[in-house]
């Protein structure tokens, strides 16, 4: 497949329990090497009945071999960018911090609190080439609006939670791999957070740096550990709900792809991000590290190396 002749505009990242792309015709598997290594899994290329192409990768690798800290997020995002991806729909299991978000409900978050403690590489811009991206609204607004219209046909009574007027849905990203203490869980609730996971950072930051529209679709599996009358969350608790969540993720994604195809083909999604980062590099051109620029050229081929 020639990526320039046939770009793949939509990327999908699967989280815990979501390791393949059911319901789609897989036509190819690719494993592009990036300056930041290989992605967590080979990327499956699927084609819809209309001919629209989708790229799918498993965040934690085939067989779930990477902890949240170990996920090669830079390679994941860079590999999708190299295929032509303009928008990413990312799925993740989350714990609920609110009574009205029960297990197996879906959430489209609007804000992020980063509690990853700087343990993960979270930028493409380093070692002699500095850029600062705008991250006040960490998810793409246009992509959010389209995905907000999906999910009305989820099974088992599950529903999609989206932003109400003046009410952000905030996801806390913790380091892991251990779950929260009860004190931490209640602290996050006091901050007004809605859900908690271990994956949205640095994924969302890197997508923004790569000028890719990004939205995470969160699938609740538990109430974390803030409910004092319940046992704290365990892997067994999470796995009980992951199977149903995967079935609903397929339903959600099938609907989302249909609604995203036209906006992507028409150049609507991500239009505000194009060249926003590469034109905002702060390092003076003549002082840019050539090795750093060579890495960044994988994302932005038009960047030039200083002479």
From Swiss-Prot:
Gene3D superfamilies: Nucleoside phosphorylase domain. Phosphate binds at residues 16, 59-60, 92-93, 199. The record marks 180, 235 as: Important for substrate specificity. GO terms for cellular component: cytosol; nucleus. It catalyses: S-methyl-5'-thioadenosine + phosphate = 5-(methylsulfanyl)-alpha-D-ribose 1-phosphate + adenine. Substrate binds at residues 198, 222-224. Its main location: cytoplasm. Belongs to the PNP/MTAP phosphorylase family. MTAP subfamily. NCBIfam families: MTAP. This is S-methyl-5'-thioadenosine phosphorylase. It comes from Schizosaccharomyces pombe (strain 972 / ATCC 24843) (Fission yeast).
